[in-house]
Amino acid sequence: FRNAGGIVTDDAIRSAMLTCNFFGTREIVIVQHTQCGMLSANAADLEQAFRDKGIDPDNIALDPTLPEQKLEKGAFAKWIGMMDDVDETCLKTIETFKNHPLIPKDVAISGWIWEVETRRLRAPTRDPEKRARTDVTSAQFGVKVKQPPRWS
């Protein structure tokens, strides 16, 4: 399953829940990558860009098959799921899958970072010394405002 930013969305949980519970999947592997475009903009700015186009993010159906499912007012920037740090996002994604009640506890869940700069796959880390020297964070893309927390 691939999505923007490798963020755990309701659709990712839905897909993982189905395959793990009914089709015998025993392992979930999360692979995120450096130089991700989801680091390159601020969620609030994206929300404003939609408003400037005449689109009201507070009044859109998230899923065309469930038009009654809408975000709470003001939650669009959080829902977009922009990120500040690939490693931190990967670690939180692993934790979210491991702790989700619809994912069986015996499913192995791991996460990895593909370093575009070094062409190396490594485990996510909070230690900046173990990251690629050229890896960027959202601040290095020029994003000055911290992203709204996806996990709270």
Where are the language model's segments positioned?
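Divalent metal-coordination and catalytic microenvironments
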Residues: 1, 30, 119
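Conserved beta-strand-loop surface patch within small alpha/beta domains used
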Residues: 1-15
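Divalent-metal-activated hydrolytic enzyme cores
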Residues: 6-9, 21-23, 38-151
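Histidine-centered catalytic micro-motifs
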Residues: 28-35
